[in-house]
Amino acid sequence: MKRTRKYQTALMAAVVSGLVFLPQAYAADTAYETDTVTVEAEGVDKYLVTTNTITAEEIAERGYRDLADILSQVPGLYMAPAAKDSKMVRVRGASSDQTKGYIDGIPAFPLTGIVSNAASDLSTIPADSIAKVEIIKGSGPVQYGTDYKGGVILVTTKDGEGTGKIRMSVAGGSNHTYDTKIGYSGSDKNVSYAVNLSKRYSAGYLENQMDKKIYFDGKIKFKTSSKSSLMLNGYYSDMEREVPQSVDPATGEYVLPSGPRWSVATGDGITPAQKKNNNATDWRFKGFKQSNIALQYESRPNDIWQYNVKYYHIIDENNLWVRNLLNTEGGSLPRFTHRAPQWYRSGWFSQGNGIEANASVAYDSKNVLSFGAKYIKLSWNTDENNSSYRRDGNDARRSFYVENAWSPDNRTRLTIGIRREDVTQDFRDNDAATQKTTSKSNAFDPVLNFTHDITKHDTIRLSAGRSHVFVGSKDAAGNIRSGYPVPKPERNSSYELGWKHKFGTKAEFDLTHFRTEVRDRITMVRFGGDCVLENVDKTHIRGLELSYRQTFSPKLSGFANYTWINAKDESTGMTTIASGLPTQMFNLGVTYREGKLRSTLLGRAMRARLDSNGEPTSAGYFAADLDLHYEPQTDLGLFLRVNNLFDTDYQYSWGSPADSTNFLLGVDMTF
């Protein structure tokens, strides 16, 4: 992990030389759209809150490889290093399990509603399958329910268009990495279709850091009439990933794990002392599978009224393996037994079905009324193999919403909506003979959004709304088992004030101030020997987002954004800093195009993350990536991605160092 000044100087000289000589490489001038995180006039902008849209063109130009990559440079979003080395997103300070994700309109990562863990690893979804990503922040649309505080992420996969074509990408690079993708798509008069398959592998830059992913998605859309369509779509992923030991940032040495010890049970020659002193290492996800299939019908009978109905089936499987240590390896176990196996597996599983119906009607020239309902039920179970301890249950949610959009004139837009959600959770321990315990909860939330065009270049927006976060059903089961009541839903009141200014057609500035007040915050507390969840805390979140983008010329464009967050927890009369969040983040990107060659430089800076006492848990840093793409002909492209260009030594979190300079070299082909 050592860095040398000589190496950095040589690398910088090579990069600068490449960028300097790019203008002389080719003489063709071509008009291009800007490659920045844009806020579009259509699409999610209709929600009248802060939104960001990243298109397929922008994804390709920046060399993003997966969804986590795409989201990493959106203002207000922090790619949080989560449990077991997974990548999850925190939106405006909200916990990673308080952001909803959808793929082609279907909920993704449903297990996060059961228990907050590493189930929602955003790096699972490859960027090559994505047509666009839309991020909704603030008091979002009521149609997505009430149980999100952070925001909503909408992923749309690519449609087929025109004559059937095969797309293929093959790449390899540092750490024995390979990344292969193949897709087929097309359309005729009444049918469009698209399928994508990808496989990625990396040995990792640390010991025990192998990462292997397989992903498939597909959709077929039938035009049933000139005003209606039927779509069958779905996705499947299978991941195997090793989780390395922590690395001390001061010494660069591996740190022996301090736990957990749940993979060891006393008895059969295993003493309480051996259980207490035993550590575990070589964590691994294996058999981490997710799949979703959906049938969606939409129709617009006339210019006044439209509706859609969707049904989906979800399966989620999450197997976590851990290897116990022997004495000779630093642990305390004298031998492996059935109470202390060499490899121990703990699994989380869920499957369920959902149905939704949404409609809107323009009942006069200034008003549109939208309404809908949803029902989703997930059945889940866990298996703790070593102790033969099993839990299972169900999580059922019913919701409806009504929203009216009013435009008194062509400069002002106002939406008022309400949503209701009812949650029923049941739980059973150990065996089928045990009677299930049931808990119920509900929430009723209003949302107000307003925008006004002050001038043709300036727009202000204001939003206020309330949301609720329900306790996960597996966590609720833990409270019931220990004899404690299930916590009430967490109440969140969100407000934002924003201003957008357009400098003609080539530049845009956006400023947003946001605030979230959390009541009845759900947190873990200890009563004697029991660790249970309870409503004891409050959280106050304040923040500021600034973003700017500009097309300087047909060849040169760029963007920059800045986020400031101040989050504080309040408990038993004491106020502390909310830990684990960086207070400031800055992103920038510059793209230069010359004929058939394109170069993009992306940078990110982050201030140190702090603990509850205000002490840094990791150092701040600045890092940059370079993406080069050469297209000798329309159906062939060569690319080089250099990550951590300046070999910055930094950590995602304490014990999780970032890779040094690494690369990926590949070719894209279309047949």
Task: Name these PLM-found stretches.
Residues 191, 304-324, 377, 451-453, ...:
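Membrane-embedded beta-barrel scaffold of Gram-negative outer-membrane proteins
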Residues 202, 229-295, 300, 315-349, ...:
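Flexible loop and strand-edge segments within Gram-negative outer membrane beta-barrel domains
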Residues 362-370, 374, 391-517, 551-554, ...:
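Structural signature of Gram-negative outer-membrane beta-barrels, strongest in the C-terminal barrel
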Residues 409-414, 514-517, 535-613, 629-638, ...:
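Gram-negative outer-membrane beta-barrel transporters
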